[in-house]
């Protein structure tokens, strides 16, 4: 009887999740602007329920799109009719999700210390929040946990503060997981937190950084969305706020900042994955950071971490105008990418958002740069498309390790070039 009950509970949990059986991810290659526009027509056909992992940008830039099983034939016919090339990147999305769940289940078990915590698996929101508490308890002189707000659904929004003392010192901000389905980012954030406590006092270069600068690390920037990726829809990107007059849920928190808000590269359609919201900072998850940054007033570097595509980006995204500090930002990016690549040979591109990928309005680092935070950067971590958002857990630690080398480069530059 008990065995049957447990099986029923497990089955109920599985059945509650959105199913992606037969969904494929296509990689579309566009040769000219006319083909880009044709793919944008596809993007507007809501009945197909397409999920663009990498949207149409410009000729030569790959487009990745998850296509639900019922829409596959129609999409392929459309592409072939217009001479647009494509390959199948992921044959069946659900197979990767099943592998991910099996790996997580096999790695379950509550860690009592940060040394026994498993950094090579994906964790739930509760497990990450537990990890934060353990880390603070182990290093009370170095780490504290701040609540900077509450999410739309009432979850606490936490930031870890790493500091060796002093009031309102110059600071570095790092956030991960603003797009909830980008699981390798939150997992990397957890690894960064542990790395900071390990390297302080051991690595002279990092010790110098933390002796002079505070570090604020927001590991789960979109807690509602992240919880939803675990409970119901692994592919959820946005927040979970409700928009009056629409059945569609959520806002893209990386289109909700007051920097070119509502311009090209964001959508006014609440059902779009890039819906910008009704007004700037409408999302409490964004407003909490805005208020924190403004109240602090001394943040010198701001780094927002996404996946995937293997990019290091700096402003601007909403306009073609180059930032005043373009040459310096470009040189830092070049050095950071070289450091990252030195570990495993992972290749990254770098440049401004609008010239490297596409125009995007209302983005995080455009706002921070406009607020006077000169060293504003955004990462897109592994990979370049084999797995996309479903990066195997075996790549978490290598991804975090190589990214840390790039972060160190940015942090050292920030320390050595005060402004």
UniProtKB/Swiss-Prot annotation:
Active site, UniProt feature: 380 (proton donor/acceptor)
Gene3D superfamilies in the record: Metallocarboxypeptidase-like, Zn peptidases
Residues where Zn(2+) binds: 179, 182, 306
Subcellular location: Secreted
Pfam families: Peptidase_M14, Propep_M14
Signal peptide positions on this chain: 1-16
Catalytic activity, as annotated: Release of a C-terminal amino acid, but little or no action with -Asp, -Glu, -Arg, -Lys or -Pro; leukotriene C4 + H2O = leukotriene F4 + glycine
Main location as per UniProt: secreted
Protein's GO biological process: leukotriene metabolic process; proteolysis
Keyword annotations: Carboxypeptidase, Disulfide bond, Hydrolase, Metal-binding, Metalloprotease, Protease, Secreted, Signal, Zinc, Zymogen
Peptidase M14 domain residues: 121-414
Catalytic activity, EC: 3.4.17.1
Disulfide bonds: 248-271
Residues that span the membrane, as ranges: none
Cofactor: Zn(2+)
SMART domains per the UniProt record, alphabetical: Zn_pept
Function according to Swiss-Prot or TrEMBL: Carboxypeptidase that catalyzes the release of a C-terminal amino acid, but has little or no action with -Asp, -Glu, -Arg, -Lys or -Pro. Catalyzes the conversion of leukotriene C4 to leukotriene F4 via the hydrolysis of an amide bond.
Family of this protein: Belongs to the peptidase M14 family.
UniProt-recorded name of the protein: Carboxypeptidase A1
Biological source species: Sus scrofa (Pig)
Taxonomic lineage from the root: Eukaryota, Metazoa, Chordata, Craniata, Vertebrata
């Amino acid at each position: 009887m008990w065995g049957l009950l447990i099986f029923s509970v497990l089955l109920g949990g599985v059945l509650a999740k959105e199913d992606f059986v037969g969904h494929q991810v296509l990689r579309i290659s566009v040769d000219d602007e006319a083909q880009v526009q044709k793919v944008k027509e596809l993007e507007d056909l809501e009945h197909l329920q397409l999920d663009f992992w990498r949207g149409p940008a410009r000729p030569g830039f790959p487009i990745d799109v998850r296509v639900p099983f019922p829409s596959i034939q129609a999409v392929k016919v459309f592409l072939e009719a217009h001479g647009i090339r494509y390959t199948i990147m992921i044959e069946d999305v659900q197979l990767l999700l099943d592998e991910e769940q099996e790996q997580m289940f096999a790695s379950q078990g509550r860690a009592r210390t940060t040394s026994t915590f498993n950094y090579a698996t994906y964790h739930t929101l509760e497990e990450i929040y537990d990890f934060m508490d353990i880390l603070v308890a182990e290093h009370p002189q170095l780490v504290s946990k701040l609540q900077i707000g509450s999410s739309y659904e009432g979850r606490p929004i936490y930031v870890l503060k790493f500091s060796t003392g002093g009031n309102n010192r110059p600071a570095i901000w790092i956030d991960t997981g603003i797009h909830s389905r980008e699981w390798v980012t939150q997992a990397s954030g957890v690894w960064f937190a542990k790395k900071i406590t390990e390297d302080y006092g051991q690595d002279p270069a990092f010790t110098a950084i933390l002796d002079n600068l505070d570090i604020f690390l927001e590991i789960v920037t979109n807690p509602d969305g992240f919880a939803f990726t675990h409970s119901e829809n692994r592919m959820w990107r946005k927040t979970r706020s409700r928009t009056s007059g629409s059945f569609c849920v959520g806002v893209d928190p990386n289109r909700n900042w007051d920097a070119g808000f509502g311009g090209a590269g964001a959508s006014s359609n609440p059902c779009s994955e890039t819906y910008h919201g009704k007004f700037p900072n409408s999302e409490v998850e964004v407003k909490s950071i805005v208020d924190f940054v403004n109240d602090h007033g001394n943040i010198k570097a701001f780094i927002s971490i996404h996946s995937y595509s293997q990019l290091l980006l700096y402003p601007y995204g909403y306009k073609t105008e180059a930032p005043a500090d373009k040459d310096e930002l470009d040189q830092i990016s070049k050095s950071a990418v070289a450091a990252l690549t030195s570990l495993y040979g992972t290749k990254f591109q770098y440049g401004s958002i609008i010239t490297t990928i596409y125009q995007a309005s209302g983005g995080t680092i455009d706002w921070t740069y406009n607020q006077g935070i000169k060293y504003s950067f955004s990462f897109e971590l592994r990979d370049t498309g084999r797995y996309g958002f479903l990066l195997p857990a075996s790549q978490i630690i290598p991804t975090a390790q190589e990214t840390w080398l790039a972060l160190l480069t940015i942090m050292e530059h920030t320390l050595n070039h005060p402004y």
